[in-house]
Amino acid sequence: MAANPALPPQNIEAEECILGGILLDPEAMGRIIDLLVVDAFYVKAHRLIYEAMLSLHGQSQPTDLMSVSSWLQDHHHFEAIGGMVKLTQLLDRTISAVNIDRFAALIMDKYLRRQLIAAGHDIVDLGYETSKELETIFDESEQKIFRLTQSRPQAGLVPLSETLVNTFIELDKLHEKLSSPGVETQFYDLDAMTGGLQRADLIILAGRPSMGKTAFGLGIAANIAKNQNLPVAIFSLEMSKEQLALRLVASESLIDSNRLRTGHFSQAEFEPLTAAMGTLSSLPIYIDDTASISVTQMRSQVRRLQSEQKGPLGMVLIDYLQLMEGGSDNRVQELSKITRSLKGLAREINAPVIALSQLSRAVESRTNKRPMMSDLRESGCISGDSLISLASTGKRVSIKDLLDEKDFEIWAINEQTMKLESAKVSRVFCTGKKLVYILKTRLGRTIKATANHRFLTIDGWKRLDELSLKEHIALPRKLESSSLQLMSDEELGLLGHLIGDGCTLPRHAIQYTSNKIELAEKVVELAKAVFGDQINPRISQERQWYQVYIPASYRLTHNKKNPITKWLENLDVFGLRSYEKFVPNQVFEQPQRAIAIFLRHLWSTDGCVKLIVEKSSRPVAYYATSSEKLAKDVQSLLLKLGINARLSKISQNGKGRDNYHVTITGQADLQIFVDQIGAVDKDKQASVEEIKTHIAQHQANTNRDVIPKQIWKTYVLPQIQIKGITTRDLQMRLGNAYCGTALYKHNLSRERAAKIATITQSPEIEKLSQSDIYWDSIVSITETGVEEVFDLTVPGPHNFVANDIIVHNSIEQDADLIMMIYRDEYYNPDTPDPGVAELLIVKHRNGPTGVVKLLFKPEFTQFLNLQRSNDY
C-alpha cells in the first residue's frame, strides 16, 4: 500500500470561523455543542480554546473574549494557544456566526475521516498479527469501526410525531406480512402522598430489571403531557425512540405489545391503533435516544427545548442513571457528579427530573425480595483481597476468607475518644461484582474500594468519590500485637535471613548467600539452634560471597524431606522466588519484641541503616525487595511497632524487576527502629549507634506526622470565638510572631495542637492531638475494573481497619424523593395479589413515606390506579 504524503483531512479556516463565531455570539454555542467534540479540532490551540468554551458554557458563563482568555490564563493554556493575539485574530477573521452549524458539520466530517484513517491503519496492523485467530481479528476490526460510527454527532431530541410515522410504517409492514402543588402524575394515591412531583426535585425511581421502571416512567410522562399539556423530555440511554414509541402505542391503544411488535394484530384493531397514534402525536413529548450522553449535553438540549416551548417543562425522564457519562477522566467522581448535576438541572429548569436507577443484585439474595433503601445506597464495599487485622491474635485475613464469619474482633476507631479499640464483627458478606478504584496514600498504603465507600477525614466521613488528591485520610498510628509468643527467637531470626537472602526452591539445596562471614556464621548458628543434629550446615566461600548450604543430616527420600523444607512448607513460604516472597501470618501473631527480632535479621539481608552525610546529615533506614507483597508485609509489621514507614516503587527502567523500598525517616520512627530493631552485623550496629547519637543531638522537625490544616476551620476558629480569644492573642500564646490568617494555611504538629487545646480549653482538639490516628495524604485514585467486593458490619463504631487504613461501610443518598418498584408475582407466580405492583416511597424529603399500590398490565406495559380519584 502506497503511503499518502498528504496532510490528514482538516479545515483550519472552518475551525477559526467556529471559534470566532462563538466569541462574537456566545449564544451560538448552544447550536453546536451537541455536534462538535473537542478532538474534532485539528489544531491543538483550537482544541484548548474550544475546551475553555465548553467549560464556561457548562457553568452557564458567557463565552466572550474576556471570559475565554481568563479561563485559559487560569488553566495555564494562554501562552500555548498564542495569547491574546490568537484570540483577537479569530475575531478579526470572523464576520458572524450565521453559518456556524454548517462549519461544525464540516469539521466533524474531517474529524471522522481522520478517525477512519487511524482505524484503517489499526485494522491493517491486525491483519499482520498471525498469532491471533481470524475470528478474533474480525471481531476487533468490527469493534473499531463500530466505535467510530458511534462517535458521530447524534440527532438530539426528535418530536414523537416524527418517530410515530416511522413506527406506524413498520407496524403496517409487519401486519401485511401476516391541580396540585406539584406536577400531577394522575396516579392518585401517589399524588396524594407527594402532592404531585415537586418542581426542582430530583427523583430516583429504582428497581430490579423487569419490575417496570421504564413503563412507569413513561406512564407519568404521558399523563403529564396529556393532562397538563406540558412538554416532557425523555433521554433514553437504553432503548431506541422506536421502542419507546411502541410501548406508548401499546399502552394508549390497549393492544398487546408483543402482537404489535410482531405485527400479529387484527384489522379491527387498526381503529384504536390509529386513534392512539393521533392522540400521542399531539402530545409534547420529545425523545433523545443517544446511547451515551453527558449531563452537559443533556442540559443544553433541555435548555433549548424550554426556550423553544417558551414556558415551563412538565418533567425530564432519564432511563437510566448508570448508563450516563460524567465527562471526567476520573470515573471515581463521575456518579456523584452526575447526580449533583441532575439536581442542579432540576433547579435550573424548575421542573422535576426523574432518573431511573438499577438496583444491585443484593435484592435477589434475600428471602424477602422487596427492595430497601440500602439496596440503592449500595453500601460501600472493598475488594476481596483486603486484609483485616484480627484484634485477638494479630493475624491478617483477607475479607473474602472471613465470609459468613461473625463474632470475631477487629480494630476500629472510637470517634468519641479517637482511640483504636477492638470491636466485634456481626456479619461479613459479599455484595456482588462492582467497579472498584485503588486509593493510594503518600505512605504507599493502598486499598481497592467502590466509589461510595467512606474514609475518615478531619471533616468527617467522606465517600471515595468525594475525596480529592492531597486530602488527608485517617490511618492507624499503631496496631497492637499479641502477648503470646508462638515462635522462638531463633526461628524468627532464621526465617528473616531465609526470606531475605535464602534460596528455598524445590529440587534445589537449601542455601543462604551473604557477603559477610559473620552473617553466614549467624545463619549456621540459628539453624543448629532450631534443628539441631537434623541438619549439617557448611559455609563455602565463592569469590566475594559466602554460601551457606544447609542439607539434612540424613538421606532424603520421597517421604522424607529436609527439616527446613517441612518447616517452611508449614509456614507456606517454601518454593518462592525472590519476587514472590512474603511474611507468613505466624509472624504477625507474635508479640512486639518477637516481631522486632524478625525484622532485625531480615534487615541484615537487603536492609540499609545509615547516616547520610551531606550539607546537613540525615539518618535513614530502608528495606529493599523485588517482592511488592513482602514490602507491604514489612510495612505492616513496622506498624505493629508504631513505625509509619513509606513504601515506594523504584523502577529499574527495563533492566530488571522493579524494586520496592520500605523507608523509615523522621526522628520518632527512627528512634523506635534503633531502640527496638537495631542490627545484627557490626557495620549496621555502628550505623545504628551513629543514628542514636545524631537523634540525641538534633531536635525533631515534624513535617509528615501532622494534623491537616482543616483543623483550623473546623475546630480551632469556632473554639476561639466561643472563648473570646482573638487571633493575635492565640498566636502570642503560641509564641508566634503575628502573621494574620497565614497561620491557618499550615498543618499542625500534634505538639502544637496540644498547646492550642490547652489555650482554647477544647476537648475535641485535645483528642485529636493525642489520637491513635496518623493523617496521610492521598496521592492517587485510579479505576481498576470490576471485581467481587465485600463488606463488614461492625455494630457500634461502624468502621474497621483494612489494609492498614480506617474505612467505613455506609453512604448517603441525596435525592429529594426515592421510589422503588416491586412486583411480587415476578418472584412468586402464585401470589395472592396478581397484577399488583407496590411503589415503595422510601425517602421523601418533604413528606411522608409509605407504599402505593398500582395495577400493572404487562401486555400493555401499563400501570393503572387501583383506586378512583380522591380530592387531596
Swiss-Prot record:
Domain SF4 helicase: 176-443, 606-870
List of residues binding ATP: 207-214
SUPFAM superfamilies given in the database record: Hedgehog/intein (Hint) domain (SSF51294), Homing endonucleases (SSF55608), N-terminal domain of DnaB helicase (SSF48024), P-loop containing nucleoside triphosphate hydrolases (SSF52540)
Gene Ontology molecular functions: ATP binding; ATP hydrolysis activity; DNA binding; DNA helicase activity; endonuclease activity
Keyword terms, alphabetized: ATP-binding, Autocatalytic cleavage, DNA replication, DNA-binding, Helicase, Hydrolase, Isomerase, Nucleotide-binding, Primosome, Protein splicing, Repeat
Keyword Signal: no
Pfam families: DnaB, DnaB_C, Intein_splicing, LAGLIDADG_3
GO CC terms: cytosol; primosome complex
Name of the protein in its database record: Replicative DNA helicase DnaB
